C-alpha cells in the first residue's frame, strides 16, 4: 500500500508509491482531507496489526509481540521517559492520544498501573483496541474513544491527570492546536508529555529510506527549540525535555544488546546526545 506524502503549502508535494517518491502537481490538500486520508491509512494498518492477528487467531498478543524485542524495548524506554518527565503516579487517570490499536495503552495499564483512556482518529483502530481490551479482561480498565488530536471533542475539560502521546503529533497538520487541546483536557497542575522526531537524527535525515522504511505522509521533524516554543505558545509551563534512543525499532534481536549500549553511552555524551532519535517534552498545565 502506497503512503501519500503532502508537504505544506508552497513546498513540493510528493506521493510515495511503494518506495519510490513521485513528484506531483496536485494542490495542497486541506487539513480535513489530510486527516481523512490518515484515518483511512491507519484503518488499513489496524486490520493487519499484531492486535488484529491476536483477535483472529486467539493467540496471546504478548506472545506475538514478544518476538519483536527491539520494538518492545523502544516502547518501554518511551513510557519510562514519559513517566519520569510527567511525574505520573500509578492509579492516575492518563489519556494517550494517537493510541492506534493500543500497544502503549495496554502496557501503561498492565505494566505501569495507570487508569487509561486511548484516543485515535482511526475508527478501525479503536474498534480493534476495544475488542482486544475485552479479550484481555481489561474492558473495565481501559476506555477507547475516536477523536481528532486538534479537537479532542470526545474529552471533557480537565478530565485527566495527564496526557501522553507517542509518534503521533508529527503527523498532525496543526501541532500547536493539538497541544492547546492537550492543555484543555488535563487538570490544572497536571502534565502533557509528547514525543517528537529529532530533526538532527541521522536515522530520519539519511538512513531511514536506505533501510527500506517508507516515508510517512505529513511526517515532520523538529528541533528542541521548536518543541519548547510550541509548548510555551500552547500555554504550558515548566517545560522540560530529554533526548533519547539511538535504537531503531527494526533492529535485529542479535544486535539489540549492542544498541542498548549505544543508547546508554549516546544519551549521556555531549554532542552525540543531540542526534538521538526522540525529543520528549513535558509541560505543566497552569494551576487554577
Segments from the language model and where they lie:
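A C-terminal cap/extension of S-adenosyl-L-methionine-dependent methyltransferases
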Residues: 193, 207-210, 229, 239-288
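Conserved class I S-adenosyl-L-methionine
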Residues: 14, 18-88
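Short alpha-helix
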Residues: 219-234
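A short glycine-rich, Lys/Arg-flanked "PGG" loop and its adjoining helix->strand segment in the class I
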Residues: 176-188
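A short acidic, Gly/Pro-enriched loop at the edge of an enzyme's catalytic core
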Residues: 150, 154-162
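Conserved beta-strand signature within the Rossmann-like core of class I S-adenosyl-L-methionine
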Residues: 190-196
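Class I SAM-dependent methyltransferase SAM/SAH-binding core
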Residues: 103-151
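Short, glycine-/aromatic-enriched active-site segment of Class I SAM-dependent methyltransferases
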Residues: 198-218
Amino acid at each position: 500500500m502506497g503512503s501519500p506524502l503532502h508537504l505544506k503549502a508552497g513546498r513540493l508535494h510528493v506521493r510515495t508509491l511503494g518506495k519510490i517518491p513521485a513528484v506531483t502537481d496536485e494542490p495542497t490538500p486541506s487539513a480535513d482531507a489530510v486527516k481523512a486520508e490518515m484515518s483511512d491509512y491507519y484503518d488499513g494498518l489496524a486490520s493487519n496489526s499484531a492486535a488484529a492477528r491476536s483477535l483472529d487467531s486467539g493467540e496471546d498478543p504478548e506472545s506475538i509481540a514478544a518476538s519483536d524485542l527491539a520494538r518492545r524495548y523502544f516502547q518501554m524506554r518511551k513510557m519510562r521517559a514519559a513517566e519520569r518527565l510527567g511525574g505520573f503516579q500509578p492509579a492516575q487517570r492518563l489519556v494517550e492520544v494517537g493510541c492506534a490499536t493500543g500497544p502503549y495503552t495496554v502496557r501503561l495499564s498492565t505494566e505501569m498501573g495507570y487508569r487509561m483512556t486511548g484516543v485515535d482518529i482511526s475508527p478501525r483502530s479503536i474498534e480493534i483496541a476495544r475488542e482486544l481490551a475485552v479479550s484481555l479482561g481489561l474492558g473495565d480498565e481501559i476506555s477507547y474513544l475516536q477523536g481528532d488530536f486538534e479537537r479532542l471533542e470526545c474529552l471533557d475539560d480537565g478530565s485527566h491527570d495527564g496526557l501522553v502521546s507517542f509518534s503521533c503529533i508529527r503527523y498532525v497538520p496543526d501541532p500547536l492546536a493539538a497541544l492547546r487541546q492537550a492543555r484543555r483536557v488535563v487538570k490544572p497542575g497536571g502534565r502533557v508529555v509528547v514525543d517528537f522526531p529529532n530533526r538532527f537524527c541521522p536515522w530520519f535525515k539519511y538512513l531511514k529510506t536506505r533501510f527500506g522504511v517508507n516515508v510517512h505522509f505529513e511526517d515532520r521533524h523538529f528541533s528542541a527549540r521548536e518543541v519548547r516554543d510550541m509548548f510555551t505558545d500552547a500555554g504550558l509551563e515548566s517545560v522540560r525535555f530529554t533526548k533519547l534512543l539511538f535504537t531503531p525499532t527494526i533492529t535485529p534481536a542479535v544486535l539489540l544488546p549492542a544498541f542498548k549500549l549505544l543508547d546508554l553511552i549516546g544519551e549521556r555524551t555531549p554532542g552525540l546526545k543531540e542526534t538521538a532519535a526522540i525529543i520528549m517534552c513535558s509541560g505543566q498545565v497552569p494551576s487554577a
